């Protein structure tokens, strides 16, 4: 996969084997999906700066307060391990863009007034090269 490449869901599924945004196995983060809130507004992921090198990624859990579920625990554990994972951005049904490799750098569990619930927010940092 090349950063920026447009992929089908079948191609994304070679890496990200589930439909949920956080794919993990045995507590280790494998890959992430986003749509930057365009399709699923309950996941309001955003670029944190104009450079595009930092993303504020919303944790797992569509309704109600987000808790330390296995996907959110895997995101937290990735801060400690420091490993990089691929991020795929949904452009439209069946069209995904490979966004390169990202490292989970930080996390905060906070009340989001707009969503009226507790959310996990993870800071993703863009990695140079192929991850």
What do these predicted regions represent?
Residues 1-96:
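Acidic, glycine-rich low-complexity segments with interspersed aromatic residues
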Residues 92-131:
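Compact mixed alphabeta submodule
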